[in-house]
Amino acid sequence: MNKFKNIAVYGGGSFGTSLASLAAQNCNNVTLFLRDEAIAKEILHNKTNVKYLGDIKLPAHLQATTNLDIIKDFELIIIALPSYAFDDSIKLLKTHSISKDNTLLIATKGFARNPTALFSDRLKTLLPYNPTAFFVGPNLAKELAKNLPASASIASLDIDIANKIAYNLSSKIFTTNVSSDIVTLQVAGALKNIFAIKSGIDLARKQGENARATLIVAALKEIAILSKALGGMQKNSDILLEGVVGDLVLTCYSLGSRNTKFGYELGISSDKQKFLQEYKELVEGREALKLVLDLIKKYNLHMPIISEVASCVIPYVMPAFAGMT
């Protein structure tokens, strides 16, 4: 199978940088594209991204730049940006003349917005001709950057594209599997962050490990409910992919997850309204929650865990949505 001659990673946060490090294990021409000139220079000269990954050393041949004009020259472009920036970032790529020859791997988790949609649906409008796949897995950024064992699922409607990407990213310590169910992988990647908030709240309430295991089972059922409503879950076995059950378990069980940490800190807070108003760190589950409620309402779905998390989070910051729970 052919290898990509070069790989771009668009997004210089913790996950984007760790994915660039992962890609560089198998490819000698990997460039990280980011907005912060100082971080780009740090990666080039020191091979670190201290702001996001501490003192973890990055591969010596990893390049970094803020110049998006050259991203069109890369065969594989990995998108690893926050969900709120997805639409604007894809539109920006279009202005930099990426062509149908550029393969896209979407590692962003969440939903497109205005209106709420899967990223795959938004790409049908913005970049309909590009080969596209989705990357979801139980991957803590710092562990990926340290080259510790991990796995992921690669999903694409074109299974040959999924296989090619998997071949380019796989190694003895990073294993992949492929799927054509792009809907379930996207839904799982978005919802797992919401369930992690619930896990953190339960941890703060000292609910115990039995409750957390029960949460995992109930969460998988809700992933299946929304996935089926959006056209996914053609095979029940899709729920067993690393990008579904593996990512869910990791995110819900690790305080290294920003979402679990957020839920825990919310749970122990004595003034929850003040906590929610003053919490500045990006929490993808909090962002996704505002959007998934649109889908629950649109398709008239019963998803009690999502509703419970909304009742804990949204009334304080978005009172108009409280009645939807």
From Swiss-Prot:
The lineage of its organism: Bacteria, Pseudomonadati, Pseudomonadota, Alphaproteobacteria, Rickettsiales. This is Glycerol-3-phosphate dehydrogenase [NAD(P)+]. Pfam families: NAD_Gly3P_dh_C, NAD_Gly3P_dh_N. SUPFAM superfamilies: 6-phosphogluconate dehydrogenase C-terminal domain-like, NAD(P)-binding Rossmann-fold domains. NADPH binds at S14, F15, R35, K109, A141, R258, L282, E284. The active site is at K192. Sn-glycerol 3-phosphate binds at K109, G137, K192, D247, S257, R258, N259. Keywords: Cytoplasm, Lipid biosynthesis, Lipid metabolism, NAD, NADP, Nucleotide-binding, Oxidoreductase, Phospholipid biosynthesis, Phospholipid metabolism. It catalyses: sn-glycerol 3-phosphate + NAD(+) = dihydroxyacetone phosphate + NADH + H(+); sn-glycerol 3-phosphate + NADP(+) = dihydroxyacetone phosphate + NADPH + H(+).
